[in-house]
Amino acid sequence: MRNLSRKTAIILAFFSLASFLSLAASEEGGPPAAKPAYLYKTTFVRAAPGKLLDLIALYKDRMASADESGDGRPLWWRHTQGDQWDLMLLTPMESYAEYYAKNKIARRKKAAEASGLSQEEFARKLEACSSWREDIFVMGPPLETVKKAFEGTAYYHIEIFVSLPGKQEELFKEREMENVYAVETGRPYNMIFVRDQGAVWDLFTLGCYRDIKHWAVGDEITKEQRAAAARKAGFNSPDEIGPYMRTLIDMHRDTMGVAIK
């Protein structure tokens, strides 16, 4: 019940900002705010020592099976600095009922066997080349929004959070406020994903960039423009953003990474 009420509160909080955020995003060319209503399975994987390339090759071999089953390929990228995992995979599910429907399970099994790498064999190989895995099921933007964000990008930044008790709703609002600031200062809109079940994280944001320079620099704007953007987002000043966010969280991790070719 706690998980359900938390998710419901966060999603309801979205509507209090949705109109304003959609307008701000459309004015600056970013995507409109999207209700977190599409289910994804997020997997973080750490390779066994010396097995990173084997791990990547194994997942690449699995992609054809995902296509054949009708599930669609997971969106994934490789860590370069930050947390302890090596790969992040974002698997589209839509909903539990859709993903675990009997016909979908049967198609998934048939596609795996036809590929020459059964589900059981894939699991054995995955265990052999990974040190640990962590799964979290999250509600996020529509699949087409996420796919579009990944198009033409090669550098990624995830911020992942455990909120302080009772601060989940306020943290979600703060993330959306930062999105207004980002769009106003010429940066990409960070997609927000809210925990449904699984690992301890309450939510994460994912930003997609052309390259590391795009992430590090953004558009050149004046100090006055940054101040105006912060006020529009609901902050008193740009200097307030980080300290305010830290009043809401128990734990926060940043990880950067690159596209997998």
What spans do the regions from the language model cover?
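Bacterial N-terminal signal peptides
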Residues: A9-S22
